[in-house]
């Protein structure tokens, strides 16, 4: 909530713990989403909600800093969700290629499909390494942790969606049928590129830090 003057910017924002049943809070209808339906989404409205000063987190004016710090962890969380979905998609693809036959041969014996599986696994491994590095930077309080979290979120969520999408392609028409889990993985991972800051915003965060003297050298 803004506790400072209207023109105080980020320095005028403070964080508070608000009881979910506080007077003045209302909740909208459950949103009918394309994916991620295991996590309900509703609009939360605050209308003249009164909160005691004792409910403030930290000092006055620290709210924006808390929010930004939470975003870094949230970005690692979303990136990890993409890793899990991509891992499952890769396993399903391996199994399907070993079971399905065309022209008297298992699909796994076709080199073009082997190459696709190899690329999916390589991208997943690279993304997992980047996410672990970002988590380490955040735990260590590294000055460039936010940039690393943005890199991990951008790469892992783009990769996660692409791996799931490629897995669906490998399954052919079966991948598009709700009886199989791949269509859900594709729908669920699509929103990862939007949550906790869109991937376009991630690129902006990264680029701004890269233009800071010494940042690029620190990546070596």
Residues covered by each model-derived region:
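Residues embedded in well-ordered secondary-structure elements
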Residues: 5, 33-35, 106
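Residue-level signal for secondary-structure boundary sites
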Residues: 7, 24-26, 52-55, 215
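Alpha-helical interface subdomain recognition
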Residues: 43-48, 53, 59-64, 68-220
């Amino acid at each position: 909530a803004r506790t400072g003057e209207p023109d105080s910017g980020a320095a005028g924002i403070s964080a508070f713990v608000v009881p979910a049943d506080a007077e003045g809070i209302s909740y909208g209808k459950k949103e009918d989403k394309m994916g991620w339906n295991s996590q309900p989404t509703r609009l939360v409205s605050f209308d003249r909600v009164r909160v005691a000063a004792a409910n403030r987190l930290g000092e006055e004016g620290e709210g924006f800093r808390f929010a930004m710090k939470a975003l870094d962890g949230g970005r690692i969380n979303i990136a990890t969700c993409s890793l899990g979905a991509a891992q499952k998609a890769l396993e399903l693809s391996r199994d399907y290629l070993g079971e399905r036959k065309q022209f008297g041969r298992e699909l796994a014996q076709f080199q073009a499909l082997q190459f696709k599986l190899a690329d999916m696994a390589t991208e997943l491994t690279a993304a997992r390494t980047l996410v672990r590095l970002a988590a380490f930077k955040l735990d260590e309080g590294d000055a460039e942790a936010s940039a690393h979290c943005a890199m991990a979120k951008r790469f892992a969520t783009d990769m996660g969606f692409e791996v799931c999408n490629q897995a669906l392609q490998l399954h052919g028409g079966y991948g598009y049928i709700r009886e199989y889990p791949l269509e859900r993985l594709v729908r669920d991972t699509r929103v990862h590129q939007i949550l906790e800051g869109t991937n376009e915003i991630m690129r902006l965060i990264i680029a701004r830090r890269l233009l800071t003297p010494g940042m690029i050298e620190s990546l070596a």
